[in-house]
């Protein structure tokens, strides 16, 4: 989790030039306005016409400067039928979520320490789940209608590492021999997968 705040409010100065390791510099409260504690951004559904059939609406410190130094952030994730939030990791935060509509298969992968086990369940509207920091996880819409969930993190900037994109769309690319050895496949398979994620998409 993030460090404890040292003041009630520290509205992020996103245009500031100062370098800060944890959080952003603070705007003077006289310049912060009166809406820094409120946001309506998650009321709108995202566009799920994407390769994954999902859309993430982020509400971290970059989108909600009032969360600066408070150690929290939120996302809304919308899913088309059959849409997925592909396997990914949040390196800096634990995630807790609630399915608001539809039904999602939520999968959480333990580390080698816990036997590399997959924990999964279909989570329905009104039900919740928790994902420990740093563990790989995914969500998949198993229903016949659109679905969405709202998740919260114990960090103003939880970070995200999409596993497929990281392996096959990095810049510069991971050398193909590394991936053929690690994945135990032929070079042609790796090159095909790289072509699917070219340009970081």
Swiss-Prot record:
GO terms for biological process: cell wall organization; removal of superoxide radicals. Homo hexamer; a trimer of dimers. Induction: By salt stress. The lineage of its organism: Eukaryota, Viridiplantae, Streptophyta, Embryophyta, Tracheophyta. Oxalate binds at residues 75, 85, 90, 95. Belongs to the germin family. One of its GO terms (cellular component) is superoxide dismutase complex. Disulfide bonds join 10-26. This is Oxalate oxidase 1. Its EC number is 1.2.3.4. Glycosylated. A form called G contains antennary GlcNAc residues, whereas a form called G' lacks antennary GlcNAc residues in its otherwise identical glycans. Mn(2+) binds at residues 88, 90, 95, 137. Signal peptide: none annotated. It comes from the Eukaryota. Residues 40-191 form the Cupin type-1 domain. The keyword Manganese applies.
């Amino acid at each position: 989790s993030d460090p404890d705040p040292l003041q009630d409010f520290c509205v992020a100065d996103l245009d500031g030039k100062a370098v800060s390791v944890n959080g952003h510099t603070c705007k003077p409260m006289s310049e912060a306005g009166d809406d820094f504690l409120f946001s309506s951004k998650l009321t709108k559904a995202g566009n799920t016409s994407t390769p994954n059939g999902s859309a993430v609406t982020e509400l971290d410190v970059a989108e909600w400067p009032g969360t600066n130094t408070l150690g929290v952030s939120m996302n809304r994730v919308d899913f088309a039928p059959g849409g997925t939030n592909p396997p990914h990791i949040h390196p800096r935060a634990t995630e807790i979520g609630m399915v608001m509509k539809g039904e999602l298969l939520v999968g959480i992968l333990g580390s080698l320490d816990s036997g590399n086990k997959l924990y999964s369940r279909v989570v329905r509207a009104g039900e919740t789940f928790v994902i420990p920091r740093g563990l790989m996880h995914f969500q998949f819409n198993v229903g016949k209608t659109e679905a969405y969930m709202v998740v919260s993190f114990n960090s103003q900037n939880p970070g995200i590492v999409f596993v497929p994109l990281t392996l096959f769309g990095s810049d510069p690319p991971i050398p193909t021999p590394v991936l053929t050895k690690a994945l135990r496949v032929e070079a042609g398979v790796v090159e095909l997968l790289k072509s699917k994620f070219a340009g970081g998409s």
